[in-house]
């Protein structure tokens, strides 16, 4: 029931797992970059419904591989949409220099950077890119070439068998997480350094 309700919420927000996965894996420019999730986030029309879907999927007691695939992609696209809603102040669906990025941008609208970083970095959080990376690696493990995966925040190492396309998608989550980590290092240094790191989150700059 929770998977069905989560799918409904996500669908209302514009998220279809198969079309999202197809677009992620057919991005010829940078299939292993955070950019793919920001491209996918352009299709999302309602962040609140994405958040509801993430919360519902987190409550599954015995998730299948399909569930892990769904919720890891869901969390990654939700993270990208959250970043866009918070920092794309000129509302052109991308992170660029005209955006008014500072240490407190849209803190009342979206969580503060500290809260957001905790959400995206902690494996205990359903919104976490760390968790999404680990669960996506588990979901895709099974066929293809043997690869080693290293999670972006806690450096959890695993070995698995993946097709090149699937490994690229796992690494895209890793790239997103590493960019978030870099932004957090810059946070508090100077507004200029932090803004530069935020603008690089979508992998376009």
Where are these regions (language model features)?
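"A position-specific structural signal for the A-helix of alpha-solenoid helical repeats
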Residues: 3-11, 73, 77-78
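Short coil/linker segments at helix-helix boundaries
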Residues: 10-64, 80-199
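Long alpha-helical scaffold regions
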Residues: 63-69, 73
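Extended, compositionally biased alpha-helical segments that mediate assembly or anchoring
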Residues: 201-205
């Amino acid at each position: 029931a929770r998977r069905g309700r989560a799918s409904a919420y996500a669908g209302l927000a514009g998220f279809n797992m198969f079309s999202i996965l197809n677009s992620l894996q057919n991005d010829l420019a940078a299939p292993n970059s955070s950019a793919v999730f920001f491209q996918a986030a352009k299709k999302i029309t309602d962040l609140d419904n994405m958040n509801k879907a993430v919360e519902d999927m987190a409550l599954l007691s015995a998730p299948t591989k399909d569930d892990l695939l769904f919720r890891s992609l869901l969390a990654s696209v939700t993270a990208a949409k959250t970043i866009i809603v918070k920092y794309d102040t000129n509302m052109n669906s991308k992170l660029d220099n005209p955006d008014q990025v500072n240490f407190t941008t849209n803190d009342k609208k979206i969580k503060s950077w500290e809260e957001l970083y905790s959400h995206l970095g902690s494996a205990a959080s359903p919104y976490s890119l760390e968790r999404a990376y680990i669960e996506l690696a588990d979901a895709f493990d099974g066929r293809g070439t043997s690869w080693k995966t290293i999670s972006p925040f806690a450096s959890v190492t695993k070995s698995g068998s993946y097709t090149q396309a699937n490994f690229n998608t796992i690494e895209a989550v890793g790239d997103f997480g590493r960019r978030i980590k870099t932004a957090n290092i810059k946070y508090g240094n100077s507004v200029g350094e932090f803004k530069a790191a935020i603008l690089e989150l979508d992998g376009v700059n």
